[in-house]
């Protein structure tokens, strides 16, 4: 649901939007999104095994990249520079080219290994944005809760949004 709400709020007419789904992400989509992932016209998709995506090269790095949600396995592989598929390669490129890389893990609790991987990624310049929703605005639906996290991702991407009330804003 996090990925869907992010995609719902990235207009491919204003932003170049690419989607890569890992095998596990495809399972998550099947379980969490009845009807599958909805993509707006203009969103480009890439096979996880295809290394021909334009953003898989330092000569054409992405402006920004979001892995949402991000498993601890993926986070660990990114932290240690493994690039066996296009998702991991693109993350590696984003880090080495000093582009914005936002990772949105939702797993809990964290082990020391996870925390050390967080540390490595933070030192490398990644933005670690755990999927910890806020409740101060009194969300009424699951989508409202998810949107508190997605709004923060959009903020870090520099994409204006009104998905969730800001601290001290009036509630509707």
Indicate residue ranges for each PLM-predicted region:
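A cross-family phosphate/adenosyl-ligand binding-site feature
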Residues: 1-102, 106-172
